[in-house]
Amino acid sequence: RQILHYCVGMEAIHVAYEKDGQLDLNALAEVLNDQIACVLIQNPTFFGSLETQGQKIADRAHAVGAKFAVYADPASLGVVAPPVQYGADIACGDIQPLGIHMSYGSGLGGYLATPVKAEYVLNYPHHLYGIFENDAGERGYFRSLPERTSYYRRAQGVEFLGTCVGLWAITAAVYLSVMGPQGMKDLGETILKKSAYAKKMLSQIPGVRLLFQPSTAFQEFVLNFDESGKSVSEVNKRLLEDHKIFGGVDLSKHYDLGQSALYCVTEKTSQEQIDRLCNALKSILA
């Protein structure tokens, strides 16, 4: 929805997904033609499942001359293959999971990764820093091709770029340097274990059904309450009023999934919190 409002003159086509949350390759084939500029997927998907058909999607996109872009959660990349390994031309996402605390809608900043080619780099709207070396072997740094940037274009800029974004980028860089490759792997494995535990416990509650099986979920997963006879809004109201718990995101307003809600765990979610949610739902749905 944000893309539709952000990029004037561009048509966004939504492609159907299978019951397990994977992209419907037949539906993708029906919309692909030489007028398609790019195929964009989110991995993990909005519903939390890991898309395992990345290379097939990339091959189909490239066959019609389109680029293949992947919106990837950086917290998952310690345990999930990076987009470049399954054919992505562009990788992008948000750096918020990298040690940045949410604060009144802030704490957000995007990352963008492409091959070092002019067709990509010259379209970057942000500052690009170059390095040069003088005769004495001293290094200097400079802003390269500033006319590309929204900072240079001012009123004609196409996105927000402020000091806070740079500060969040520094925070994310420090977080990554401290964590290192092993730390990011440990982070991903911790989230996977907690997600698996939460799904196992919640799916055992009468009236609760786990959707998009048997796909592996990373952080998010979808719970359906149709069998309980209660709506998501009812469940969320009781969770908040009786147990001081914020319920899952109500998907019934935008997706044909019945009374379903999107839940999420992170590395900071404790087993005690998961058990507390389970007990609360048991009492609400009893």
Which role fits each region the language model picked out?
Residues 17-22, 44-51, 69-70, 81-82, ...:
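Hydrophobic alpha-helical scaffolding
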Residues 1-140, 146, 229, 233-238, ...:
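Conserved PLP-enzyme active-site core in the AAT-like
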Residues 29-30, 54, 151-154, 250:
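Glycine-/acidic-rich phosphate or pyrophosphate-binding loops and their flanking alpha/beta elements
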Residues 182-276:
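Conserved C-terminal alpha-helix-loop-beta "cap" of PLP-dependent enzymes
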Residues 97-206, 210-214:
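Active-site C-terminal subdomain of aminotransferase-like
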